[in-house]
């Protein structure tokens, strides 16, 4: 029942974290 609400939230948080990690990793260590 609550899966319908929790699942999209988990997907959204995962996407935000991944984008943040990609952005920080790409700009914090441009040579890496």
From Swiss-Prot:
Q: What triggers production of this protein?
A: Constitutively expressed, may be induced at pH 5.5, repressed by thiol oxidant diamide (at protein level).
Tell me, in one coarse class, where this protein mainly resides. membrane
Q: Where are the transmembrane segments?
A: 3-23
Q: Any keyword Cell membrane? A: yes
Name this polypeptide is given: Uncharacterized membrane protein YoaK
Q: Subcellular location, in the record's words?
A: Cell inner membrane
GO CC annotations?
plasma membrane
Tell me the keywords, alphabetical order. Answer: Cell inner membrane, Cell membrane, Membrane, Stress response, Transmembrane, Transmembrane helix
Q: How does it sit in the membrane?
A: Single-pass membrane protein
Source domain of life is Bacteria
